[in-house]
Swiss-Prot record:
Bias (Basic and acidic residues): 28-41
Pfam families, per database record: Ribosomal_L32p (PF01783)
The family this protein is said to belong to: Belongs to the bacterial ribosomal protein bL32 family.
Key words, A-Z: Ribonucleoprotein, Ribosomal protein
Keyword Lipoprotein among UniProt keywords: no
InterPro entries xref list: Ribosomal_bL32, Ribosomal_bL32_bact, Ribosomal_zn-bd
Coiled-coil ranges from the UniProt annotation: none
Name of the molecule in the record: Large ribosomal subunit protein bL32
Ribonucleoprotein as UniProt keyword: yes
Chain positions covered by the region annotation Disordered: 1-41
Length: 59
C-alpha cells in the first residue's frame, strides 16, 4: 500500500482543494442575436454555432 513520505501541509491541502469550489457559470453575449449564452454552446434561439447553422431556428 502506498504511504505518503511527508505530511501534506495545510497550504498544499488548501491549494489542492481550491479547485473543488463551485463557480458561477460564464455567459457571453452572442454576436448575432445579442443574447447571453454559454461559451462553446449552440445558440438555441438562432441555431448557430461558430457562424454556421447547426439547428433549425426557433420562432
Amino acid at each position: 500500500m502506498a504511504v505518503p513520505k511527508r505530511k501534506t501541509s495545510p497550504s498544499k491541502r488548501g491549494m489542492r482543494r481550491s479547485a473543488d469550489a463551485l463557480k458561477a457559470p460564464t455567459y457571453i453575449e452572442d454576436k448575432n442575436s445579442g443574447e447571453l449564452r454559454r461559451p462553446h454552446h449552440i445558440d438555441l434561439k438562432t441555431g448557430m454555432y461558430r457562424g454556421r447553422s447547426v439547428l433549425p431556428a426557433k420562432d
